[in-house]
């Protein structure tokens, strides 16, 4: 006989605040953030990175969280220098992106220096900002000042330093 408590998923921890270091820690923060977004019903998510090559976007658990999160009225903004690594490494995410095109805005800035592009996940509730993407060192938190400053930086990139990119379908002749 199995105990019902043994079959229930682990409750999500509150998202942390403070410094983080290491690729595995970073990737787990991304997984936890998307799971929390689905659980808590975040209305908007913005992700930004030069290439997203080390983000766990193609993992089943991430796409399942995004699927649970996605619905009408939600907004997902994605900013990158190039989406080549996303297409090559994250097939599940690319399929999810095609399904939910109506709530997703993708922007690209191919001429930008990849080191200048913010590597971040922003929501109205919590943010994660990799200050050194190579070493996976960054900060997280829900403080209003941190959220506002990061959003202003991301808005500058979205509005003034990028163009539409990563279409959900490619039409051929």
Each language-model region and where it sits:
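PLD/PLD-like phosphodiesterase catalytic module centered on the HKD motif
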Residues: 1-46, 50-173
